[in-house]
A protein has these predicted regions:
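Glycine-biased, small-residue-rich flexible motifs in mid-sequence functional cores and linkers
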Residues: 1-173
Length: 173
């Protein structure tokens, strides 16, 4: 049985910057090496970097699909999904054959939020599914952490806003 006290969701933008890639890799590596299971959505950007870093650190990770288990989205992460099943899990609430649909992502985000003791947003613009996940986590009474970024950079606006609104500032693991 999964011990939720030892899980952390790592979420953020699909259009990751070099800074976002670096900080996501650093934090996911350190958290996985410390024994936490990393939970994310297997999307391009932050999700994929977090999963890869957790695996490379010898840790466990859980990928939550917004499609049926038999639908590889994004197709670029087909191999990563296979690797995750060897030391973690791939989960979905959607039946096999369920294709990608925009309305599936809030449901996927809900599952990510429920599987984790806390959620770390490493890079996100103001309009981001990661902020939806952070809002769900807040309503569940769990901790939201966010990485601060350049106040002039659009991909930092979501994280900076979360910190302004009370999220814990994450600078290192």
């Amino acid at each position: 049985e999964q011990d939720l006290r030892r899980t952390i969701a790592i979420v953020g933008t699909r259009r990751i910057s070099p800074y976002g890639r670096q900080i996501t890799r650093l934090l996911a590596t350190d958290l996985a090496a410390a024994g936490l299971t990393v939970v994310s959505g297997l999307a391009l950007g932050v999700d994929g970097v977090a999963h890869r870093a957790a695996l490379d650190a010898g840790g466990r990770t859980i990928a939550v699909f917004g499609t049926g288990i038999d639908i590889n989205y994004p197709s670029q992460h087909r191999g990563l999904a296979r690797e995750i099943t060897e030391s973690g899990a791939v989960v979905t609430e959607f039946p096999p054959g369920t294709e990608l649909a925009p309305e599936n992502f809030p449901e996927r985000n809900r599952i990510i939020s429920r599987l984790s003791m806390a959620t770390l947003v490493t890079e996100a613009p103001l309009k981001s599914g990661a902020l939806i996940t952070a809002s769900l986590v807040n309503h569940q009474g769990r901790d939201v952490l966010a990485v601060p970024g350049d106040v002039f950079f659009v991909l930092s606006a979501g994280c900076n806003g979360l910190i302004r609104d009370g999220a814990v500032m994450a600078r290192n693991s």
